[in-house]
Amino acid sequence: MSISSDEVNFLVYRYLQESGFSHSAFTFGIESHISQSNINGALVPPAALISIIQKGLQYVEAEVSINEDGTLFDGRPIESLSLIDAVMPDVVQTRQQAYRDKLAQQQQAAAAAAAAAAAAAATSANNQQPPAKNGESTANGEENGGHALANNHTDMMEVDGDVEIPPSKAVVLRGHESEVFICAWNPVSDLLASGSGDSTARIWNLSENSTSGSTQLVLRHCIREGGQDVPSNKDVTSLDWNSEGTLLATGSYDGFARIWTKDGNLASTLGQHKGPIFALKWNKKGNFILSAGVDKTTIIWDAHTGEAKQQFPFHSAPALDVDWQSNNTFASCSTDMCIHVCKLGQDRPIKTFQGHTNEVNAIKWDPTGNLLASCSDDMTLKIWSMKHDTCVHDLQAHNKEIYTIKWSPTGPGTNNPNANLMLASASFDSTVRLWDVDRGICIHTLTKHQEPVYSVAFSPDGRYLASGSFDKCVHIWNTQTGALVHSYRGTGGIFEVCWNAAGDKVGASASDGSVCVLDLRK
């Protein structure tokens, strides 16, 4: 038997990821140097740690229940143990002695019952009553039956059958060999990109004229070793299409960003980060790519040459998210609790926002680029303006960490100028909230999810919001009324949801390696 600390650490790291503890997984991965291990994560099946623990538990159960000669202990079947029971000292001897004591009590009780039965046999013969006919029932029986039926419910939140998306309207795409962290629709066609822990991204063709159904292109992320390309065996952590839909950028735990054509060909490999990449975005013009990494830096890349235009080393801890304000100005956030606004060509931030008291998970500029929203593990959502040094709104309603935020594509500067601007926040408290930022109030609290919510996305017209949670559900909400209008339960925890450009399909990526596409057309 051979067990290394690297192997144990990797299984713990994967368990944290699969269970939705993304921040814990990140911290543990850094401290245990997971990125430097040679373990091929694509070959390790999901739930590997749980599987090996279950086998160990079964071994202890066998120890309790089986004698040294292989026979069942006192003829009984294998006893079920909890995990905590199994690690207790002397569990085998303790359980076997407890069973001996119980067996002795049962034998004594059986002897007493037999004597009582013999004594009552004579009198019972004189007091027999005819048995009830088939089909007869007592009033008490009816009452108990009704009570049992009334209480036959589950803890799972009930969803109205009218809003459930039928299987005929859901396409489940299989191919990834590990959890799928991210997905994004091409902005001009029905191509869906996905990124996974199996060190691949994939492009799925969901268009009506696809000749062979939903075809997939596999984008394998490789690194150079010994003069040849070998799989990186690292998670694909981020991806983004350019505005024309011709190029896909991906970021990986191997520290490289890559640019691919929509046909799946590798166009460029961008290598200057000194560790995993956590976020990556194209600017609107399509000439620059922005990335954020664990090395505490952000980098603007020239998309045409693949060269780094400028590296910004201003954070004191890993950078978690980035968002463009304009074609050459952006904001970044970090576990250092700070937000920096930087501009290409400037050697220091043009603005720094401070006020969060825990790591800042996500940032997003509103459609006009005037307001910046941020969310944090401090359970607050803050709104910032370049005209002020402190936040203009400090929104406190969630009671657990806020994982992500999205602005609606409505209001000034959008294709829906007459609709009100809204902000959505998704939290580990299992709720989604919709905010009127102008007034600084929560207008809807969406509460059907049962587990942490990892992703929200507005439809292109802003009328609907999709949310995805680790409860395996994708919910579609009416943003005006807060009503649930569609619901789908998948086969794995949902990491990401996204709308296609036409607003009639929702893509979702899941922890079990599946990608599902929901067709919302009537």
Swiss-Prot record:
GO terms for cellular component: histone deacetylase complex. Residues 122-150 are annotated as: Disordered. Gene3D superfamilies: 1.20.960.30, YVTN repeat-like/Quinoprotein amine dehydrogenase. GO terms for molecular function: transcription corepressor activity. Residues 41-86 form the F-box-like domain. It holds the Pfam family WD40. Residues 123-141 have a biased composition (Polar residues). The keyword Transcription regulation applies. This is F-box-like/WD repeat-containing protein TBL1XR1-B. The keyword Repeat applies. The F-box-like domain is related to the F-box domain, and also functions to recruit ubiquitin E3 ligase complexes. It comes from Xenopus laevis (African clawed frog). It comes from the Eukaryota. F-box-like protein which acts as an integral component of the N-CoR transcriptional corepressor complex. Probably regulates transcription activation mediated by nuclear receptors. May mediate the recruitment of the 19S proteasome complex, leading to the subsequent proteasomal degradation of the N-CoR complex, thereby allowing cofactor exchange and transcription activation. Belongs to the WD repeat EBI family. Interacts with heterodimers of rxra and thrb, and this interaction is abrogated by thyroid hormone binding to thrb. Interacts with ncor1. Keywords: Activator, Chromatin regulator, Nucleus, Repeat, Repressor, Transcription, Transcription regulation, Ubl conjugation pathway, WD repeat. Residues 4-36 form the LisH domain. It is found in: Nucleus. WD repeats lie at residues 175-214, 231-270, 272-311, 314-352, 355-394, 397-445, 448-487, 489-522. One of its GO terms (biological process) is regulation of transcription by RNA polymerase II. PANTHER family: F-BOX-LIKE_WD REPEAT-CONTAINING PROTEIN TBL1XR1 (PTHR22846:SF40), WD40 REPEAT PROTEIN (PTHR22846).
